[in-house]
């Protein structure tokens, strides 16, 4: 837009850091007429070109682009192409109060992306509804750009940084400062369980009015769908819009009742362990390798000479069995059974060949599911397996079904076996083994391999490991803002 402030400075600096000196950061300042209604502040919206140039340069921007209206809309705003944001994403929060606003946003951003063709699009989390709509835009149109978010920057009195803050006089500023503090206090009360959500919203409205603010809306919505939040969701968005005099202000907080849980399911050989381990390290999550736990039980059954297909024989070996997973260290997680390190042993082809048989026994699944759910009580983890999103953590915040074609998985399996020093069958034999294991996993009676209804399918054929991890991070950030789960530094 324009009227750059410290929130924009943080956004620019973060984008510069993400480039690592290998790219350029272009800052666009265009006051888009399509985003303003008839009685809104288009004519008086801050246009501070000299100050914007100085701020962008100091923050590390490579260039500042300040197009005029004809450059962006060569046929005029009434004759050119216009997009319409989906009604489901604009039915709540700012949508009903700013008719056509988000249509103007998606139209100008699509135009910007077409002209610039960036690799990344950096936006502030302050306007979460706008950020979410643009993430949907990029996903739905299959655009080759990553949408990245930057946490809300707050000024000294707690007010979210905004170009419109300069409209406020000293007295109004004092009144407006009650906005963010009231939101934060309400979120704390809801998280603590001292008040139910509906009552909290009523009380918040009253508190804002008593502070001298005119309330437009106070709503709690799902961060991804922007629809009223389903009871029991661990992460919800509490958002509000008020007017302080003639100045319209928006703000939000997240209500998070436990740390995030990510469930990654998929067939054997899809690369789940490799990418989930790296994703956990990137996002600061505990890595729960449930597949390794089933492999550990399989190894235990084989080492005791029991028949993996016999449920009574397997169940007899489970009493007192302890499977331990250590935290990741330099990308490696140690697996122990009753204190013995079997990290390498569980990757033996003999274990691989029997793990589906052992995992199909209800007694094994009951034991390990209970252990896994106990680890997940506080959240803050990512788990991968076959039934994480359907059986182990059905309330996971993010669910992904990671897969690849049997041909691709056979090639990956061959490389893994070769790297570990094992004999490598021909690709046709490996592919046949993979297809058979898929059949066993998907047809077993207890917790079969199926994609959860609310999971996102990610097909990884042709993708590098880094690209898959980026895709997982983007799915995570769709729901989990940096302001509530910052990306670890270093």
UniProtKB/Swiss-Prot annotation:
The active site is at 8 (proton donor). Residues 1-253 are annotated as: Pantoate--beta-alanine ligase. Beta-alanine binds at residue 35. It catalyses: (R)-pantoate + beta-alanine + ATP = (R)-pantothenate + AMP + diphosphate + H(+); CMP + ATP = CDP + ADP; dCMP + ATP = dCDP + ADP. It is found in: Cytoplasm. Pfam families: Cytidylate_kin (PF02224), Pantoate_ligase (PF02569). One of its GO terms (biological process) is pyrimidine nucleotide metabolic process. Pathway: Cofactor biosynthesis; (R)-pantothenate biosynthesis; (R)-pantothenate from (R)-pantoate and beta-alanine: step 1/1. (R)-pantoate binds at residues 35, 130. In the N-terminal section; belongs to the pantothenate synthetase family. In the C-terminal section; belongs to the cytidylate kinase family. Type 1 subfamily. Catalyzes the condensation of pantoate with beta-alanine in an ATP-dependent reaction via a pantoyl-adenylate intermediate. This is Bifunctional pantoate ligase/cytidylate kinase. It comes from Synechococcus sp. (strain WH7803).
């Amino acid at each position: 837009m324009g009227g750059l402030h410290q929130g924009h400075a943080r956004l620019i600096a973060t984008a510069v850091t993400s480039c690592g000196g290998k790219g350029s950061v272009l800052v666009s300042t265009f006051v888009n007429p399509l985003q303003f209604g008839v009685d809104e502040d288009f004519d008086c919206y801050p246009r501070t070109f000299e100050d914007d140039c100085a701020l962008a340069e100091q923050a590390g921007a490579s260039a500042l682009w300040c197009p005029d209206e004809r450059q962006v809309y060569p046929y005029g705003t009434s004759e050119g192409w216009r997009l319409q944001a989906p009604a489901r994403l604009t039915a709540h929060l700012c949508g009903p109060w700013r008719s056509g606003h988000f249509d103007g946003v998606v139209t100008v951003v699509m135009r910007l992306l077409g002209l610039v063709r960036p690799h990344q699009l950096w936006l502030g989390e302050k306007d979460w509804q706008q950020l979410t709509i643009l993430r949907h835009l990029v996903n739905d149109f299959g655009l080759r750009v990553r949408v990245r978010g930057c946490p809300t920057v707050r000024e000294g009195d707690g007010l979210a940084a905004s170009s419109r803050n300069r409209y406020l006089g000293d007295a109004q500023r004092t009144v407006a400062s009650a906005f963010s503090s009231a939101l934060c206090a309400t979120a704390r009360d809801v998280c603590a369980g001292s008040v139910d959500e509906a009552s909290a919203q009523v009380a918040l409205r009253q508190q804002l009015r008593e502070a001298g603010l005119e309330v437009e809306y106070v709503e709690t919505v799902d961060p991804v769908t922007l629809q009223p939040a389903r009871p029991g969701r661990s992460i919800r968005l509490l958002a509000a819009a008020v007017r302080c005099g003639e100045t319209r202000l928006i703000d939000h907080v997240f209500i998070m009742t436990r740390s995030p849980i990510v469930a990654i399911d998929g067939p054997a050989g899809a690369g789940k362990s490799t990418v989930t381990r790296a994703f956990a390290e990137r996002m600061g999550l505990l890595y729960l390798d449930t597949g390794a736990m089933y492999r550990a039980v399989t190894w235990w059954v084989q080492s005791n000479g029991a028949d993996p297909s016999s449920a009574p024989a397997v169940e007899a070996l489970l009493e007192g069995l302890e499977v331990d997973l250590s935290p990741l260290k330099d990308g490696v997680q140690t697996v122990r059974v009753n204190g013995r390190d079997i990290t390498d042993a569980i990757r033996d082809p003999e274990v691989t060949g029997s793990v589906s048989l052992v995992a199909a026994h209800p007694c094994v699944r009951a034991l390990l599911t209970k252990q896994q759910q106990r680890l997940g009580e506080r959240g803050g983890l990512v788990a991968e397996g076959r039934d994480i999103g359907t059986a182990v953590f059905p309330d996971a915040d993010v669910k992904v079904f990671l897969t690849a074609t049997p041909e691709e998985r056979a090639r990956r399996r061959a490389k893994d076996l070769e790297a570990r020093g094992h004999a490598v069958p021909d690709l046709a034999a490996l592919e046949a083994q993979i297809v058979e294991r898929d059949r066993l996993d998907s047809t077993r009676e207890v917790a079969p391999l199926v994609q959860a209804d609310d999971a996102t399918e990610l097909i990884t054929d042709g993708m590098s490991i880094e690209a898959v991890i980026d895709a997982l991070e983007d799915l995570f950030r769709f729901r989990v803002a940096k302001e509530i789960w910052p990306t670890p530094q270093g």
